[in-house]
Regions:
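Short secondary-structure boundary segments
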Residues: 18, 62-63, 84, 128-131
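Substrate-recognition element of Asp-dependent hydrolases with the DxDx(T/V) motif
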Residues: 47-71, 81-82, 118
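Non-catalytic pre-domain segments flanking phosphatase-related domains
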Residues: 1-18, 164-172
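Conserved functional loop/turn residues at catalytic and ligand-binding sites
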Residues: 15, 54, 63, 76, ...
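Asp-based phosphoryl-transfer active-site loop
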Residues: 9-26, 118, 151
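A positional/architectural concept
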Residues: 22-53, 62
């Protein structure tokens, strides 16, 4: 497991793409044509804990699947930007909504539509299997592939930096 080289105690918010980050890059299709996604339970645990501990979490995705909205809303995520055609606009809306600076935001993306946000946020991160163009912009490349724990990786490191990871109330 590698460690993020950044003062993580400064991070107040994390934003994530879904496809290729919080779900794998393979998207099975339901017979109706609706894309289906798998999600990582450990990513989910870390995200809901971060919400409970007061960090701002956003989902910024080009997808519009109702199942994705339901999943992340159930984890307590309030800032869901679905159908995001130009992600930088939604990133800035999220940042400005909470009066954050770019240096206080970690963003994790995996493909070309994420690059503009990654160039603006303070801590651009990506999964191990991100495209080369994204890896060249990332300050941290997770040990895990998309949909296989890369979200947990970065959330856990941020919570540890804030002294919130294994706090007594992390168990209930």
């Amino acid at each position: 497991m590698s460690t993020i080289n950044y003062d993580l105690s400064r991070i107040k918010a994390l934003a994530f793409d879904v496809d290729g980050v919080l779900s794998s890059t393979t998207v099975p299709l339901h017979p109706s044509g609706e894309p289906m996604r798998t999600v990582n339970i450990k990513d989910g645990y870390a995200i809901q804990l971060a919400v409970k501990k007061g960090l701002h979490i956003a989902i910024i995705t080009g997808g519009r699947t109702e199942a994705v909205r339901i999943r992340f809303a159930a984890l307590g995520v309030k800032d869901l930007y679905m159908g995001s055609a130009v992600k930088i606009h939604d990133y800035r809306d999220f940042r400005d909504k909470y009066g954050l600076t770019d240096d206080e935001i970690l963003y994790m993306g995996d493909d070309v539509p994420d690059i503009e946000v990654m160039r603006e946020c303070g801590l651009p991160c990506c999964p191990k299997d991100a495209v080369p163009e994204v890896k060249s912009v990332a300050k941290y490349i997770s040990y895990a592939d998309g949909g296989r724990g890369c979200g947990r990786d970065v959330v856990e490191q941020v919570l540890k930096a804030h002294g919130l990871w294994m706090a007594e109330d992390a168990f209930g």
